[in-house]
């Protein structure tokens, strides 16, 4: 009985825990938007950057996936030893910066490196989120928060498809757009 009492004391109060889960779900939604948006915008990107099918394949697959998968292990290790909210915050900053950098890509390698960094940044989220949920809820009450968090995996692609459709519609009707300080940008660049 004493272990159960100690275990319950380490959990956050209910409202703080649910706020944390909700924030992580929103981050998960954005992570999936970032993953899917490239695939939807690939035709205008391919045309503007003069990319080959092989380069497109590398951007859609290995550039993100290899780094996302391989960084998950060391980041999971770090999540067990360091402050998880700090790790996730740094990860969100890295992937947001890398996503924005995707919009400034002028060559294949620019976009490839940006996608690699998106993978590295996004790899922080799930190990930390699941660990935070584990710490924030007793074992018998973890199903709902994990379920809420993982809904981001379905909502994110839906949001990406909606945003991608809007950008593709815009791309077909707009030429270059002059942004003060940044100069001329294609509509696909603004999607990032």
Each model region followed by its residue ranges:
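Cytoplasmic helix-loop-helix junction between adjacent transmembrane helices
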Residues: 113-153
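Membrane-interface helix termini in secondary transporters
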Residues: 44, 76-77, 166
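Helix-breaking motifs and short loop linkers at transmembrane-helix boundaries and internal kinks
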Residues: 50, 83, 104-110, 121, ...
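Conserved MFS/SLC helix-loop-helix module at the cytosolic interface between two early adjacent transmembrane helices
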Residues: 70-109
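Cytosolic juxtamembrane N-terminal segment immediately preceding the first transmembrane helix
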Residues: 1-33
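Residue-level signature of mid-helix packing/kink "hotspots" within the transmembrane helices
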Residues: 32, 36, 64-73, 123, ...
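Helix-loop-helix hairpin linking two adjacent transmembrane segments in secondary transporters
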Residues: 149, 153-192
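Extracellular/periplasmic helix-loop-helix junction of adjacent transmembrane segments
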Residues: 41-70
């Amino acid at each position: 009985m004493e272990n159960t009492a100690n275990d319950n004391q380490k959990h956050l109060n209910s409202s703080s825990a649910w706020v944390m889960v909700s924030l992580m779900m929103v981050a998960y939604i954005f992570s999936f938007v970032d993953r899917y948006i490239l695939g939807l915008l690939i035709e205008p990107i391919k045309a503007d950057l003069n990319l080959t099918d092989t380069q497109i394949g590398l951007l859609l697959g290995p550039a993100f996936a290899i780094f996302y998968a391989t960084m998950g292990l060391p980041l999971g290790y770090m999540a067990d030893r360091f402050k998880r909210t700090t790790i996730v915050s740094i990860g969100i900053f890295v992937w947001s910066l890398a996503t924005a950098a995707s919009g400034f890509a002028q060559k294949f390698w620019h976009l490839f490196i940006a996608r690699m960094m998106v993978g590295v940044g996004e790899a922080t989220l799930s190990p930390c989120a699941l660990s935070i949920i584990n710490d924030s809820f007793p074992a018998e009450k973890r199903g709902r928060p994990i379920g809420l968090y993982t809904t981001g995996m379905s909502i994110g692609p839906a949001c990406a498809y909606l945003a991608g459709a809007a950008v593709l519609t815009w791309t077909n009707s707009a030429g270059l757009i002059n942004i003060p300080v940044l100069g001329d940008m294609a509509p696909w660049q603004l999607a990032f």
